A protein has these predicted regions:
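Glycine-rich cofactor/substrate-binding loops
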Residues: 2-43, 104-105, 288-468
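Acidic, glycine-rich loop-and-beta core segments that form the ion-binding/anion-interacting portion
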Residues: 222-314
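N-terminal, Lys/Arg-enriched amphipathic/low-complexity engagement segments
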Residues: 210-226, 449-452
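Conserved hydrophobic residue
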Residues: 56-57, 81, 271, 386, ...
Length: 468
């Protein structure tokens, strides 16, 4: 019985006793790395073609291996491939199944290859595909944000600092801030792809191989830019996972910030937007409740993305070159992070599509807390040639006066305003209203409706022209 299980192991020849149960359990990764079946088959086909082309195995053997791998691919797609947990991982499961299908010739597939470079190749193919998918979904969200910004370019709302009403802005301007953030996120993934897209295949365990393999051929066949130049680096590095997870963590922080704002905006304290019932849940005890769970879940799940990055960094920080089994920990963390970021992107897109801003509530809130005080100070500088620090002090005194009288800045009389500076004239009322405040903004990138409309139009055009 002890030898029966060992015979199932591709590496079992050197061992005389069975593995302990705990060793089998800890060593198995099939529960989570089975999702790499397609990458593993594609990479193995490229390797088999190269072995045949270089006459390391015969062309007949090469074709037989490739044919068997294609049959396995079909079985996975149909959901009829039986995974054996005793075979540890997806790589050994596929190879063992290939042996059942085509016999001993399957044993030649691993010529000039180790699981070390095999796993690294599969993971690079996986990360490349996932980064491309993330980029697509980011673009999808940017398009929705730009459309909404274009539609609501002149809806006045309060802008905040320290969670206190600060200055009037437009709803469209606020949404476009996230378009800009997401563009930087997208660029980080594009940049990471340059370093992900290098082939470790052929590095073998760590020292390369004595077989006359053609790494350029397999690299090209798999769509990589080039084969990696150092075999030790090829099998031991995981920065090709860490870098996109760092980008994903920054993206997650942006999605979480947006989610937090959605949660605030639908609350009774703000009541800025409305979400449909389809994106909310109720309470098991309070019949009146309509909760923004979708945004709360995004906010919560994105912590796992950041956590995955931290965990992999901790795994890597103490590993000597080249390969150690610690590296198996990268997969489960990575898969969870990628799943969560992709789901979060879908959720945020649904929120943006279906949210409806409440114009009157937004405008009313924008008039509160003396939000045009900065405009008043700027008017004193521009029209009365008062130094800004002095204008700041005068405006502060005016605000204190309004607080005492419980009135808005726009409700002040010219007589009251002149009591603070005799040179103040009726023109000052043009900047005391929130709508006038945003319309007066002139600087590039500002919140004026005209500027927001131009920016939204620019983004809509740019995103339409991007490659899908």
């Amino acid at each position: 019985m002890a030898r029966k299980i060992q015979k199932n192991k591709m590496w079992g020849g050197r061992f005389n006793t069975d593995q302990d149960k705990i060793m089998l359990e800890m060593n198995s990764s099939i529960e989570f790395d089975s999702r790499l079946y397609l990458e593993d088959i594609i990479a193995s086909i490229a390797h088999a073609k190269m072995l045949g082309k270089k006459k390391i195995i015969s062309s007949v053997e090469s074709q037989k291996i490739i044919s068997g791998l294609k049959k396995i691919k079909i079985e996975f797609e149909k959901g009829i491939f039986n995974l054996d947990p005793l075979l540890e991982d997806i790589h050994m499961n596929i190879e063992a199944n290939l042996q059942k299908k085509i016999g001993n010739v399957a044993k030649k597939l691993h010529t000039g290859r180790s699981r070390n470079d095999q796993v690294a190749t599969d993971m690079r193919l996986y990360m490349r595909k996932q980064c491309q998918e993330i980029i697509k979904k980011i673009t999808m969200i940017q398009k929705e944000l730009s459309k909404k910004a274009n539609k609501y370019y002149d809806f006045i709302m309060p802008g905040f600092t320290h969670m206190q009403i600060a200055q009037p802005v437009t709803f469209g301007h606020h949404l476009l801030a996230y378009v800009e953030m997401l563009e930087r996120d997208k660029n980080r993934f594009h940049d990471a792809l340059k370093r992900i897209n290098q082939s470790p295949l052929g590095a073998a365990a760590l020292a390369g191989t004595t077989f006359p393999i053609d790494r350029e051929m397999t690299s090209k066949a798999l769509g990589f830019t080039n084969p990696m130049a150092n075999s030790i680096d090829a099998v031991s590095s995981r920065d090709f996972i860490i870098e996109p997870l760092a980008a994903a963590s920054i993206l997650a922080s942006h999605l979480s910030r947006f989610s937090e704002e959605i949660i605030l905006w639908v609350s009774e304290g703000f009541d800025f937007i409305e979400l449909p019932d389809s994106l909310a849940t109720g309470s098991s005890i309070m019949p009146q409740k309509k909760n923004p769970d979708i945004a709360e879940l995004v906010r919560g799940k994105n912590g796992r993305v950041i956590g995955a990055l931290m965990s992999i960094l901790v795994v890597m920080k103490g590993l000597p070159l080249a390969y150690s089994k610690d590296l198996q920990e990268d997969k489960e963390l990575t898969f969870d992070a990628i799943d969560n970021i992709l789901n979060s992107l879908e959720a945020i897109n649904a929120i943006i599509k279906k949210l409806k801003p409440k114009k009157e509530n937004l405008s009313s809130a924008a008039q509160k807390s003396y939000s045009t005080a900065t405009d008043l100070a700027d008017w004193l500088v521009s029209n009365l040639n008062i130094p800004f620090r002095e204008a700041h002090k005068i405006t502060g005194n005016i605000v204190r006066y309004c607080e005492k009288k419980k009135i808005k800045l726009s409700e002040l009389t010219i007589k009251e305003l002149k009591s603070f500076n005799k040179k103040i004239n009726d023109d000052i009322f043009n900047v005391l209203d929130a709508e006038q405040s945003v319309n007066q903004k002139k600087s590039f990138g500002s919140t004026s409706p005209l500027m927001v409309k131009k920016s939204a139009t620019k983004w809509i055009k740019k995103l339409q022209n991007e490659k899908k």
